[in-house]
Amino acid sequence: FIDEVKPNLDEWGKKQQVDRTLWNKAGDAGILGSSIPEEFGGFGGDLGFDAITLYELGRTAGDSGSWGYAIQSIVVHYINAYGTDEQKKRWLPKLSTGEYVASLAMTEPSTGSDVQAIKTTAEKDGNQYKINGSKIFITNGGSADLIVLAAKTNKNEKSKGVSLVVVETKDLEGFSRGKPLKKLGQKGNDTCELFFEDVKVPLTNLLGSEEGQGFYQLMKQLPWERLA
């Protein structure tokens, strides 16, 4: 697999994005399912499997060699930890095969990574959330089919007002992406802004048993994110 990655690094660096076929090849090779439970299409490894995979990708293919794998594996851990069985059945197999590319959308233009201060909102509208706001510096943002989005479900609260909502982007009205952001390193990892204007997703896309758990969920997973 690495032999297929290396010859393309310069081209991907110039494009600021890897070819989509790479994700499918990574899925075929079993790389994307290292920590996904077997019943959902992976082979049931732990954090150690992901760490070794990241190490090998970086060692053999440089700073563009991970091509967003770290973010994909981070999102897997969120769905594993907080998703319902139905959510896991729906999303994990697609993440394992590379059919879906994932991103975690937390950072915002005006607040950085201060999650308590985010401005993006997800307001209930019947049986849906209506999402408005923007995110910046989002790895895999240009490719993402699935986004774990940090948003305020209660604008009057700080940390207790944050929830994580899964957004599937295909043909999604009101959702748009900015141009790839140029970086000093990790040039093959596409990074961009994301915009949400009255975007609607089902209430069942909430991660966790109730609203307001997002800040805790993010802090709980932060050690793995930093390792990745």
Describe the predicted segments one by one.
Residues G68, L95, S110-S113, F137-N140, ...:
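Short Gly/Pro-enriched turn/cap motifs at secondary-structure boundaries
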Residues G45-D46, D114-Q116, N140-A144, K158-G161, ...:
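Short glycine/proline-enriched turns and hinge-like loops at secondary-structure junctions
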Residues V101-E123:
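A gly/ser-rich beta-alpha-beta helix-loop segment of oxidoreductase catalytic cores
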Residues G30, T53-G58, A150-A151, V167-L172, ...:
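Short Ser/Thr-interspersed hydrophobic loop/turn segments at strand-loop and sheet-helix junctions
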Residues G44-E56, D114-I118, F195, V201:
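Structural signature of FAD isoalloxazine-binding scaffolds in flavoprotein oxidoreductases
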Residues F1-A70, A81, E86-R90, K94-T97, ...:
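Amphipathic, small/basic residue-rich leader segments at the start of a protein or domain
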Residues L164, F175-A228:
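Glycine-rich beta->alpha junctions and the first turn(s) of the following alpha-helix
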Residues N132-S176:
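A short core secondary-structure module
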